[in-house]
Amino acid sequence: MQQKVLSSLEFHKVKEQITAHAASSLGREKLLQLKPLTDLSDIQKQLDEVEEASAVMRLRGHAPFGGLTDIRSALRRAEIGSVLTPAEFTELSGLLYAVKQMKHFISQMTEDGVGIPLIQAHAEELITLGDLEREINSCIDDHGEVLDHASPALRGIRTQLRTLESRVRDRLESMLRSSSASKMLSDTIVTIRNDRFVIPVKQEYRSSYGGIVHDTSSSGATLFIEPQAIVDMNNSLQQAKVKEKQEIERILRMLTEHTAEHTQEIAQDVEVLQTLDFIFAKARYAKAMKATKPLMNGDGFIRLKKARHPLLPQDQVVANDIELGGDYSTIVITGPNTGGKTVTLKTLGLLTIMAQAGLHIPADEGSEAAVFDNVFADIGDEQSIEQSLSTFSSHMVNIVNILKDVSENSLVLFDELGAGTDPQEGAALAMSILDEVHRTNARVLATTHYPELKAYGYNRQGVMNASVEFDIETLSPTYKLLIGVPGRSNAFEISRRLGLPEHIIGQAKSEMTAEHNEVDLMIASLEKSKKRADEELSETESIRKEAEKLHKDLQQQIIELNAQKDKMMEEAEQKAAEKLEAAANEAEQIIRELRSIKQEHRSFKEHELIDAKKRLGDAMPAFEKSKQPERKTEKKRELKPGDEVKVLTFGQKGALLEKTGEKEWNVQIGILKMKVKEKDLEFLKSAPEPKKEKAITAVKGKDYHVSLELDLRGERYENALSRVEKYLDDAVLAGHPRVSIIHGKGTGALRKGVQDLLKNHRSVKSSRFGEAGEGGSGVTIVELK
């Protein structure tokens, strides 16, 4: 696909928008290389990946990308034997941790039954290198400093360094405390010059201390001298520092060699994490744009529902339905300039390119997009100064090139076709060019302000006229696309509303041909009919959606009711079975005891017979009651709505709602409503008398104890955001108008995550960092709705 077309449709600006959602420079790099694909299966795979990432975000909020940095140059240096720096090892350790975290995160999602096969496949390519990560962490801290315990030798050297340094300082400080020091020294401090300890001596007392001058003040009045008394001590200190440097070099070289053994695995991890960042950035962009996954086809059919231009402010952009490639393969949008025709044309082109680049598009669910081998566009004033071409010539050169390469698998966009020359000749050329492209069966969207093209779509099969609606009341375009209705200039109406005298307008109308006036009247009538039809269709669609939702809700209620009923029946049967088993066990025990007495040839004693009879009686009635519940109501009591009853089948209490038949009632049991036969009901008590007092709904309010602050310090990022979500809900229930969230200052990652969550939370009115007395930027104050 030509770069010129991508630029004219401003695809590069879309990519810039998406890069803002990447978690790393690696992700941004891959996003900037994004380009449209032409293989349907590849496109579908990328769209599905974004869909899976969106599902992960809905369920978990985000994926863990902390620690993902670009260490590819360090890996290349390790391969050729260059020793890596402590800072580079810190970044490498962070990356290895990120690999481990991501692998565990995706694994946990799949174990929980979340279907993300494509993302799972990427995660399975990650290679964890726990031994290398632990080795690096045992030698280098998070700030890139080599730890004392990186080796026994380094620990010993640093112990010696601290001892020597302490001796040097003690000796110098004793010099500073001497009685003559205040006279001879510029300041009573120990400082460092050329990595050696020195004291500031006044110029005139240089000879009093001897030793080595390492530096001079800018005025020359002060000399920074290493006194002779500590030269040998400083030399010993320097020798120890050389040993420290050599040991650190040895440790870093060892770590570099171990890293070099795994550069291929690490490079693969970098590539996989880059791809995952790329996918999740596209998903975050889709969420921000309220974009959906388009249904892709290779048949050249486009149906965009409520399509919106992604580069226009989302609170101002007008959504349009655009269909192409079904009953008609060419659309010609006519009407005056500045009417929004070009925006519609660019929306179609840009959304097609976005879909082919594996991006979700800003359009409603169910939108369909086609895969084209090429998208051609002739948009805007592209005259070439270098070639000394006029606007018309420049456009014509572009059109000639399009005609050479266009095919049935092309999408062609013409903006103001035929403009820049004599109107009659331009209109004739426009129709001829459209005919030529239409014959190739390419998909075409063209805009023009030539009135001659208004009738173009009426006498050509597969061509449809369209226009952009103009509001006469406000004298401005609504940017609403009207398929099947050609455009008109509205010049007379606009002039009348702006105050042009009526006799001038009347004379102008008389200059127009009768045929032209009839066409304008026909178009006006079509516009009204189209608007009325759209309103009726919108109302019908709204009713249909409401009916579908109601039907779905009812089906769900039936499923839940049946599930509850089955559960209650199962519990009742289980209880009955348990009682039966207990009775049978008791009976068997009694029989065994009686048989034992008989086998011993003993006569039955009276108390033994009485006891056995009693135990049988205790066991059997319980079973019989459970098997044969009394299924009758009070004979002398007439049931009425509101009565509390017992449903004998389930042994559950309920309230009567209404009588549905001669011997049948609707009963409310908890959250369930069901029909029950009257014989299965037992009256418990009458309906309470209605109270005249106003009903009070009990909700959790200010007595519900929730702290006014939430401390997140020390929490992991994911756990912290989850706690914030729950805390805000609890705080609202508790009636708190304002709460504080303590996240600390740190690296700022948690603070940013909290701020981003608060921006979109339904219960948050506003948020700000704390004042000086409230904790500053380490605390966020939240005003609740």
Curated annotation (Swiss-Prot):
What SMART domains does the record tag this protein with? MUTSac (SM00534), MUTSd (SM00533), SMR (SM00463)
* Keywords (A to Z) from UniProt: ATP-binding, DNA-binding, Endonuclease, Hydrolase, Nuclease, Nucleotide-binding, RNA-binding, rRNA-binding
The UniProt entry's GO biological process terms, in alphabetical order, are:
mismatch repair; negative regulation of DNA recombination; rescue of stalled ribosome
Recorded hits in Pfam families, A to Z, give: MSSS, MutS_V, Smr
Q: Which Enzyme Commission numbers does its entry carry?
A: 3.1.-.-, 3.6.4.-
User: Which residue range or ranges hold the Smr domain?
Assistant: 710-785
Q: Which GO terms describe its molecular function?
A: ATP binding; ATP hydrolysis activity; ATP-dependent DNA damage sensor activity; endonuclease activity; mismatched DNA binding; ribosomal large subunit binding; rRNA binding
- Annotated residues that bind ATP are located at G335, P336, N337, T338, G339, G340, K341, T342
Q: What does this protein do?
A: Endonuclease that is involved in the suppression of homologous recombination and thus may have a key role in the control of bacterial genetic diversity. Acts as a ribosome collision sensor, splitting the ribosome into its 2 subunits. Detects stalled/collided 70S ribosomes which it binds and splits by an ATP-hydrolysis driven conformational change. Acts upstream of the ribosome quality control system (RQC), a ribosome-associated complex that mediates the extraction of incompletely synthesized nascent chains from stalled ribosomes and their subsequent degradation. Probably generates substrates for RQC.
**HAMAP family named among the record's database cross-references:** MutS2
Q: Which NCBIfam families match?
A: mutS2 (TIGR01069)
**The family this protein is said to belong to:** Belongs to the DNA mismatch repair MutS family. MutS2 subfamily.
Record's subunit section: Homodimer. Binds to stalled ribosomes, contacting rRNA.
Full protein name: Endonuclease MutS2
Name of the coding gene: mutS2
